[in-house]
């Protein structure tokens, strides 16, 4: 669609805005313009709380909401029980890798979600009493829900990505989730980051307006943020919460030279992955393997990305 094209332009110009020392005002202006055009032309609107938390269609069905600008439909003849997106990220399904990996949110990020922000409901609270007090909507029937909470659920477990139709036991029904490639919400964040480069006050207004759709009691307010650096940090926190598990933040963190913080007091990361990186992580630069550049005269080891092996130190 034209809106998806505008969205791709917005993504590209936002990246290009940082290519020049001190920023490229023209690229940032175009990023904001294309992001706004994508919003307008698409006619799309941010997800509501009901759509976000729906145990049958949450983040698995493009036709169930008015948020997705671009996505891929998936049918059950294209997937197996474990080789698909749902099997890796939908914790309520009983057939996938999630029964072992139990993906969840970083505790430090969870603690930054405002109390009135309904995105809290994508992740199980460390207070287990909230699991059964009506705070959450779970997929499956009562028996399936009880089994999930008893054996698979842990504090901070993600329930953002639901098995299709809320089916937790039959993978041919629960696995074929539509693949989301671009939500209109991303355009709002691109616009505010680009606008912030020249008009911080307007960018704060844009973030406040967006967050009023997430913190429904109206209590969110970033007006006190004093400079561009602090605004970008706050904006990234909200963007991380918004797009957790969707693959959007990878490029933001590379572009803005942000690091990884997993080793800290009270961290919920497994020890083998609990490392900290100041600035972009070396593992984010993909390395072409030796067999490929030995067989392909068009590339060489000299032009390859550096091998990141051994550059990440895991604390004892």
Predicted regions and their residues:
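A low-complexity, Ser/Thr/Gly/Pro-enriched, surface-exposed linker/loop concept
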Residues: 89-90
């Amino acid at each position: 669609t034209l809106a998806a094209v505008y969205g791709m332009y917005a993504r590209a110009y936002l990246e290009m805005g940082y290519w020049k020392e001190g920023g490229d005002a023209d690229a940032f202006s175009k990023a904001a313009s294309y992001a706004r055009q994508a919003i307008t032309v698409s006619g799309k609107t941010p997800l509501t709380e009901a759509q976000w938390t729906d145990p049958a269609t949450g983040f698995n069905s493009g036709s169930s909401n008015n948020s997705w600008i671009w996505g891929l439909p998936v049918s059950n003849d294209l997937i197996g029980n474990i080789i698909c997106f749902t099997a890796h990220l939908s914790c309520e399904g009983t057939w996938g890798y999630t029964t072992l990996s139990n993906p969840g949110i970083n505790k430090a990020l969870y603690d930054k979600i405002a109390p009135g922000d309904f995105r809290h409901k994508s992740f199980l609270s460390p207070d287990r009493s909230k699991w059964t007090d009506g705070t959450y909507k779970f997929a499956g029937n009562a028996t399936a829900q009880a089994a999930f909470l008893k054996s698979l659920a842990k504090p901070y477990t993600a329930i953002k990505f639901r098995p299709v139709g809320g089916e937790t036991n039959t993978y041919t029904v629960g696995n074929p989730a539509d693949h989301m490639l671009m939500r209109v919400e991303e355009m709002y964040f691109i616009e505010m980051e680009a606008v912030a480069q020249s008009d911080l006050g307007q960018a704060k207004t844009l973030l406040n307006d967006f967050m009023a759709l997430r913190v429904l009691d109206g209590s969110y307010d970033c007006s006190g943020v004093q400079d561009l650096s602090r605004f970008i940090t706050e904006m990234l926190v909200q963007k991380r919460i918004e797009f957790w598990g969707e693959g959007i933040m990878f490029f933001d963190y590379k572009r803005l030279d942000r690091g990884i913080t997993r080793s800290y007091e009270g961290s919920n990361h497994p020890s083998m992955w609990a490392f900290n990186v100041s600035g972009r992580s070396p593992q984010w630069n993909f390395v072409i393997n030796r067999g490929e550049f030995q067989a392909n005269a068009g590339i060489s080891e000299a032009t390859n990305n550096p091998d990141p092996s051994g550059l990440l130190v895991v604390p004892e």
